[in-house]
């Protein structure tokens, strides 16, 4: 990033998405008036960033800044299948583009055995229904639910599919099964994907067959009502620091399939956890680490809700829901890329890194987990960083003035 020409922050923040839209998207429609695709893309990201309580409030804020748009034009855009196709294409290509740009910012760089495996934490996320949403047969509103994936290499987010909303209720699992293989098409890494999910995604025979067909491997938790038969140990090196906390690593049989079963006792808390997986080539401590990193998707949802204020559906129907999910994920990824670019200029989230180090140093050596200490960059976007970006874009601040603000807010808490 260079500041010699002193551009505005908003000119550089949206530049990657606009570049992809202009040069790599087939569903783009060129128009110079009204709500162009470029304007729709920018406004959708800003709608997610500005934390306005409603779509009308967002449009008023735009109008008060001399950027007015008819209300019907904005809301009708969220019913457009063509615009959804355009946005989906931008989001998909942006993930691939950002993955390359963040090449040296890999959460899992210390673990060479994961270099060529896509590793995705997957979970559902619910927000309040839209104002005009339908009620179900019992007269109740249904929250809008979307499945997302978080890349555990780069921290990038991608929506997968909607599983409920507008009077319809579905469990995450069948929706995930219907969509995940299409969702992972074009994944840049060469080896089999690893999916890390909570016990809602337990289906032992399904995952064994997926591995046999070389589609994907699973890491999840054993359910309390599962009664395995232990066949024998897999064997692991207890002296490997990565395996600290591993009690046992066994082959286990369940009602309809055999999996690897890892009993882990968290050194910091003493809590016992049991993981099941079809990954047979990874060290057991690394299996435990990847499951612990699954919680980072929960942290991302907390950012969506409490730091970005995205708590309610913007419209009704699957088209509007998917557009909103793409805009929120694209914003998350643009913020992640901006943070990485700032790091290349010498800035970093010093306050977060120092706090993590202090928390770790308080633990006695026998309660520390070396595997967790080897994970870099895996922290949530902070309130101060998000506010600084929001203010820089809202008030059209040039980089010459914004850079010292980023330095101040990233180095220490208010």
Give each language-model segment a name.
Residues 30-33, 61-76:
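Short, basic interhelical loop/turn and adjoining N-cap
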Residues 49-64:
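Short, charged amphipathic recognition helices of the HTH superfamily
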Residues 287-315:
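Short amphipathic alpha-helical "interface-anchor" segments enriched in bulky aromatics
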Residues 43, 58, 70-75, 119-127, ...:
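Short, conserved catalytic/metal-binding motifs centered on acidic residues
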Residues 92-98, 160-271:
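An internal, acidic/charged active-site-proximal segment
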Residues 75-153:
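Active-site-proximal, Lys/Arg-enriched surface segment
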Residues 1-24, 31-34, 111, 212, ...:
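A short, flexible helix-boundary coil/loop motif
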């Amino acid at each position: 990033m260079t500041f010699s020409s002193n551009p505005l922050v908003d000119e550089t923040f949206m530049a990657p998405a606009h570049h992809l839209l202009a040069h790599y998207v087939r569903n783009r429609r060129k128009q110079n008036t009204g709500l162009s695709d470029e304007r729709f893309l920018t406004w959708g990201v800003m709608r997610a960033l500005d934390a306005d309580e409603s779509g009308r409030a967002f449009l008023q804020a735009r109008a008060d800044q001399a950027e007015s748009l008819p209300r019907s034009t904005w809301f009708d855009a969220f019913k457009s299948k063509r615009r959804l196709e355009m946005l989906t294409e931008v989001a998909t290509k942006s993930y691939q583009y950002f993955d390359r740009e963040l090449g040296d910012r890999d959460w899992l760089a210390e673990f060479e055995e994961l270099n060529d495996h896509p590793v995705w934490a997957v979970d559902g996320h619910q927000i309040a229904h839209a104002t005009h949403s339908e009620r179900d047969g019992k007269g109740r509103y249904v929250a809008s639910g979307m499945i997302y994936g978080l890349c555990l290499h780069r921290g990038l987010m991608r929506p997968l599919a909607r599983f409920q909303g507008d009077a319809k209720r579905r469990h995450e699992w069948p929706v995930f099964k219907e969509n995940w293989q299409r969702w992972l098409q074009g994944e840049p890494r060469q080896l089999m994907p690893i999916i890390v999910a909570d016990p809602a995604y337990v289906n032992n025979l399904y995952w064994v067959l997926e591995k046999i067909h070389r589609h994907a491997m699973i890491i999840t938790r054993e359910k309390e009502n599962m009664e395995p038969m232990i066949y024998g140990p897999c064997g692991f090196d207890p002296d490997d620091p990565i395996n600290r906390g591993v009690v046992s690593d066994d082959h286990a049989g369940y009602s309809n399939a055999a999996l690897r079963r890892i009993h882990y006792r968290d050194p910091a808390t003493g809590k016992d956890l049991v993981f099941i997986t079809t990954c047979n080539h990874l060290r057991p401590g690394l299996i435990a680490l990847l499951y612990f990193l699954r919680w980072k998707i929960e942290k991302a949802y907390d950012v969506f809700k409490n730091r970005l204020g995205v708590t309610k559906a913007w419209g009704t129907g699957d088209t509007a829901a998917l557009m909103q999910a793409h805009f929120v994920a694209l914003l998350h990824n643009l913020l992640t890329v901006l943070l990485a670019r700032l790091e290349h200029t010498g800035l970093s989230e010093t306050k977060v890194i120092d706090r993590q180090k202090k928390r770790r140093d308080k633990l006695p050596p026998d309660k520390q987990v070396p595997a967790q200490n080897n994970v870099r960059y895996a922290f949530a976007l902070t309130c101060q960083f998000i506010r600084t970006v929001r203010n820089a874009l809202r008030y059209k601040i040039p980089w010459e003035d914004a850079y010292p603000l980023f330095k101040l807010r990233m180095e220490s808490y208010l």
